[in-house]
Each structure stands twice: as C-alpha cells, then as structure tokens.
Amino acid sequence: MAFDKKLLEIVACPVCKGKLDYDKESQQLICKFDKLAYPITEGIPVLLENRATAIVTE
C-alpha cells in the first residue's frame, strides 16, 4: 500500500508538532527541525518517538 501524501496536511511531528516531509525513496516522514525520521509501514506512518531514527548530518 502506498503512502497517501494528503496525510501530510494533517500529521505532525509528535515531538515538536512541526511539519513533516515525505521521503519517497526511504519511505519515511522527516522532521527537519528535530532531525528525526519516522518509518512508514504498509502505507501507514508510525509516528512514535521510540520508533524514530536520528538523522545525522555532517
């Protein structure tokens, strides 16, 4: 099942309540402010802080 991009209008980062961006290649929702990536499983975003992975930038 594909992720419905219309969900981006209503979902928010559970940590900061900010906007999330969809990364189609990695199938994740990205919070640029907190530098966290939330997985999308079978088209459903898993917006649990303990399931997020930190994004490391250099």
UniProtKB/Swiss-Prot annotation:
Coiled-coil region: none
Q: Which Pfam families match?
A: Trm112p
Give a GO cellular-component term: cytosol
| InterPro entries for this protein | Trm112-like
Record family assignment: Belongs to the UPF0434 family.
Tell me what this protein is called.
UPF0434 protein Sfri_2386
Q: Which organism is it from?
A: Shewanella frigidimarina (strain NCIMB 400)
